[in-house]
């Protein structure tokens, strides 16, 4: 997210923050009630459409603006849940190396609207399907021709989630090693982020 938002114009960043605050103020969620889930979907689609229009107006890939929107949303949400002080909030988002104009705008939102946003965001909870099992094994595909016979090992992976959905796919040996590297790097990055108070793990309540 950070390398992306560093390339955005300040006016576009302000548009994203305005939509972010609007989203956090309007999404009172109780997924036990079907009508509340429908309302959440409508709000999400509306914000997404507005973000897409703003992205197109600023000649920005909507996928990139969605990444920045989501990242800023979780920074604010976690800070509100942790109830960090204004000073710690500024110090932590500065450590993240966000653009200075974004730090200023984000700090202003946190200083002036944190009470209202906290009351709303702390009362909602969205539960997405979770990974229930992940299996993998090495398989060998035999490719034969008139002149040669080649053994091509691949990794077969199977993922299952708590909704009962299953997905099976193949990964080449090279991509499997890249996956191992990126998974290890991600775990290290998460460990580093946990040292920042507003991004530390939330305690289960």
UniProtKB/Swiss-Prot annotation:
PROSITE patterns: COMM
Annotated Pfam families: COMM_domain
Highest taxon listed in the record's lineage: Eukaryota
Sequence ranges assigned to domain COMM in this UniProt record: 130-194
Cited InterPro entries: COMM, COMMD5
A single cellular component GO annotation: nucleus
Family: Belongs to the COMM domain-containing protein 5 family.
Subunit field text: Component of the commander complex consisting of the CCC subcomplex and the retriever subcomplex. Component of the CCC subcomplex.
Task performed by this protein: Scaffold protein in the commander complex that is essential for endosomal recycling of transmembrane cargos; the commander complex is composed of the CCC subcomplex and the retriever subcomplex.
Protein name (Swiss-Prot/TrEMBL): COMM domain-containing protein 5
Record organism: Dictyostelium discoideum
Lineage: Eukaryota, Amoebozoa, Evosea, Eumycetozoa, Dictyostelia
Gene: commd5
